[in-house]
Amino acid sequence: MRRFYYRHSRGVTEVAVGKRLDYATYAPSPLVLIEEGLPSPLEGPSLRLRGGEEVKSFDSLLRVYQFLAEQGADRSSTLVAVGGGALLDLATFAAGTYMRGIGLVLVPTTLLAMVDAALGGKGAVDVGPVKNLVGVFYQPRAILCDLEWLQSLPDRVYRSALAEVVKYGVALDADFYQWLAENVDEVLRRGERAVEEVVYRSLKIKASIVEVDEFEERGIRQVLNVGHTVGHAVERVFGLLHGEAVSVGIVAELKMAEELGYLTRGTSEEVATLLTRIGLPTCIRASAEELEKAKSLVKFDKKRRGEYVLMPVVVRLGKWVLEKVHVGEVERAVDFVKCSA
């Protein structure tokens, strides 16, 4: 097992990565919120909810509050959330607001949740069609990434999550990117050491960003949105998995950076080659109508400021800058998602 700690406004969070983790050490008397269909790793009172984005509703939130109240939870209690990213989002919001904050331990069970959603302190619920409209920043006491959960993960879901891993290398750590390129076959085979390295290094990289910009006030945390400006629009229009859309978005945004003179030409092709080896899409067979729909979504990106979108731009592998990019240039980047043949 490997572990590290990161600091934040509430103190320190322990992050553990390995197999057969001792959950009881982190929550001796847990109240367990667990995704339906998963075996509970802990004994104690539990509430089961469906996974997926639909769980991030006020109805689900009320059920969690009622569960905590029925169990007599107070500020010394610990909620242990076991599941994918959406359930962890809900749990974070619930723990951060119930009695103005109770203990929280997160147990992500998907690769995407491990390398992305679990770390950062964000909790939210959706309001109608608007995702994450109501939210909090609330850091957990511990994040327990037990790699045993990943052995039964469907192949497409596993590969999709690797887009976020590639993002860390592309934007923040060229050495990690090179390691991924050299070890991609072992990662795809889910070799224990390779998967542990993927999860551990991804979390270390993200933690280094969260530590210096916990509340998204300095612009540094924007780097975690590389590939997401275009990717979010692609995800909504084409119905891809999140990581698949981010993969397409990474390549499109790198091409945009090349066109604008920020990035050496050929970098986008190099990254696209790695993503293709992973089995992820790097372009889409899109109609003109679909591209226009995606462009219209970019106009409503939350990072937009007037005629510009404040977005992270990669200038070389492992390095980035925060730039105001004209909306027209971002719309042109959407054109890059279309396969040339």
Curated annotation (Swiss-Prot):
Keyword Zinc on entry: yes
Superkingdom classification of source: Archaea
GO molecular function per UniProt: 3-dehydroquinate synthase activity; metal ion binding; nucleotide binding
EC numbers on record: 4.2.3.4
Gene3D superfamilies: 3.40.50.1970, Dehydroquinate synthase-like - alpha domain
Binding site for Zn(2+): 164, 228, 242
One Pfam family per UniProt: DHQ_synthase
Keywords: Amino-acid biosynthesis, Aromatic amino acid biosynthesis, Cobalt, Cytoplasm, Lyase, Metal-binding, NAD, Nucleotide-binding, Zinc
Cofactor: Co(2+); Zn(2+); NAD(+)
Location of the protein in the cell: Cytoplasm
Record-listed NAD(+) binding positions: 85-89, 109-110, 122, 131
Catalytic activity: 7-phospho-2-dehydro-3-deoxy-D-arabino-heptonate = 3-dehydroquinate + phosphate
Any one of the GO BP annotations: amino acid biosynthetic process
Function field: Catalyzes the conversion of 3-deoxy-D-arabino-heptulosonate 7-phosphate (DAHP) to dehydroquinate (DHQ).
PANTHER family to which the protein is assigned, alphabetical: 3-DEHYDROQUINATE SYNTHASE
Family: Belongs to the sugar phosphate cyclases superfamily. Dehydroquinate synthase family.
Name of the protein described by the UniProt record: 3-dehydroquinate synthase
Protein source organism: Pyrobaculum calidifontis (strain DSM 21063 / JCM 11548 / VA1)
